[in-house]
């Protein structure tokens, strides 16, 4: 990638109104100044270990390994404080915002996990937080809305458009443009205009760095295959990036939803085409007129119609395989992991688990397969129980 211009091959860039250009340049320059600063790194590391609970374990799944006929490990991002990998990024960006003298954080959220992680970081660093969340997502994730409010964040339900993550992001960008002098927009995935995809990737790379080290310690070699779910793609890029130059197969798993027909999935890299959304050029789910298409996924965190520009480049280079699984397969994987390993995965993460279960015949006995378990499933238990016909 040309770091200076923020392009990954042909993807990425800064397609934003003039009012935001200065803020993006300011953020880029502050990040380059601070990312290698020993004081900043030490403070971030201290928060990640003492507060977020890193490093996270690399858990060997005995029962699933036996069933799949290979060695299956889970990288346990579900054990990070707050229940998902999101805090790796929000702590980093909140510290960055503080160092830049910003007085307030705003964020967009889909499943609510990024909103919760931003609220946690804001509370820990004493920065006020406002979160934009689609009305439909607020309804799907009531518990996360309450969690955010409990930690002092103000949640703005967004009623425009499809009332989901795309619309929440539009509102957050509008708010940022109005209050850019004292506000930091804390983007939750490797999307948006440069330098956001780079910053989020770097803060999430701790996942892959730890996995690399832990696998060498446990197995004496690197994994054969890494598998992670892809919505915007931050847990996946965090897992993949530190091993891109190694001989490791990588699979990103998108939301196949109900079907691969328009409006029924969130499989951007499998069904989309290049276009511009939220300030960057990347693959998009769009109609013939170039309008952003309707998406669907069983998991609120994977129904984003775009994807990180670096993933778009990795797809076109054939460095990473991008696959998909369907909603019903995800539910099976959700139940399977809970039942056989005693670990309830987030519906997002269950997409990655499902891919391994579904493709178990393609692995050899000695293959080491690492799944990024990006989050825990507590937030999904009540909606899944309804799908299974149970009581809440």
Swiss-Prot record:
Class of this enzyme: lyase
Origin superkingdom: Archaea
Record's keyword terms, sorted: Amino-acid biosynthesis, Aromatic amino acid biosynthesis, Lyase, Pyridoxal phosphate, Tryptophan biosynthesis
InterPro entries to which the protein is assigned, alphabetical: Trp_synth_b_CS, Trp_synth_beta, Trp_synth_beta/beta-like, TrpB-like_PALP, TrpB-like_PALP_sf
Keyword Cell inner membrane: no
Lyase recorded as keyword: yes
Reactions that this protein is recorded to catalyse: (1S,2R)-1-C-(indol-3-yl)glycerol 3-phosphate + L-serine = D-glyceraldehyde 3-phosphate + L-tryptophan + H2O
Known function: The beta subunit is responsible for the synthesis of L-tryptophan from indole and L-serine.
Subunit annotation: Tetramer of two alpha and two beta chains.
Entries under NCBIfam families matching the protein: trpB (TIGR00263)
PANTHER family assigned to the protein according to its UniProt record, in alphabetical order: TRYPTOPHAN SYNTHASE, TRYPTOPHAN SYNTHASE-RELATED
The protein's name: Tryptophan synthase beta chain
Lineage of origin: Archaea, Methanobacteriati, Methanobacteriota, Stenosarchaea group, Methanomicrobia
């Amino acid at each position: 990638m040309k770091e200076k211009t923020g392009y990954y091959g042909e993807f990425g860039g800064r397609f934003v109104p003039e009012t935001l250009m200065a803020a993006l340049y300011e953020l880029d320059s502050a990040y380059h100044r601070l990312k290698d600063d020993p004081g900043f790194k030490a403070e971030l590391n201290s928060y990640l270990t003492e507060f977020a609970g890193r490093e996270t374990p690399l858990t060997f799944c005995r029962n699933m390994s036996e069933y799949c006929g290979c060695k299956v490990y889970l990288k346990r991002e579900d054990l990070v404080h707050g229940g998902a990998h999101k805090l790796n990024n929000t702590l980093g960006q909140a510290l960055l915002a503080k160092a830049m003298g910003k007085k307030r954080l705003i964020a967009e959220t889909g499943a609510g996990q990024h909103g919760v992680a931003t609220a946690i970081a804001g509370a820990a660093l004493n920065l006020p937080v406002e979160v934009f969340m689609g009305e439909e997502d607020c309804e799907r994730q009531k518990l996360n809305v309450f969690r955010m409010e409990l930690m002092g964040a103000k949640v703005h339900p967004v009623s425009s458009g499809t009332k989901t993550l795309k619309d929440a992001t539009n509102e957050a960008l509008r708010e940022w443009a109005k209050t850019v002098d004292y506000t930091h927009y804390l983007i939750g995935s490797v999307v948006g205009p440069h330098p956001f995809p780079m910053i989020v990737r770097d803060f999430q790379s701790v996942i892959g760095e730890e996995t690399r080290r832990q696998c060498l310690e446990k197995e004496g070699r690197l994994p054969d295959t890494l598998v992670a779910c892809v919505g915007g793609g931050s847990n996946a890029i965090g897992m993949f990036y530190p091993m891109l130059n190694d001989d490791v197969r990588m699979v990103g798993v998108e939301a196949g939803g109900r079907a691969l027909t328009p409006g029924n999935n969130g499989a951007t890299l499998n069904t989309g085409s290049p276009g511009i959304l939220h300030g960057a050029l990347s693959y998009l789910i769009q109609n013939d007129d170039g309008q952003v298409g309707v998406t669907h996924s069983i998991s609120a965190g994977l129904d984003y119609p775009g994807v990180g520009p670096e993933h778009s480049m990795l797809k076109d280079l054939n460095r990473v395989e991008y696959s998909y699984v369907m909603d019903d397969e995800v539910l099976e994987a959700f139940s399977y992991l809970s039942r056989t390993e005693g670990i309830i995965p987030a519906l997002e993460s269950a997409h990655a688990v499902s891919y391994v279960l579904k493709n178990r015949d393609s692995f050899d006995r000695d293959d080491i397969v690492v799944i990024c378990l990006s989050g825990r499933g507590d937030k999904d238990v009540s909606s899944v129980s309804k799908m299974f016909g149970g009581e809440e």
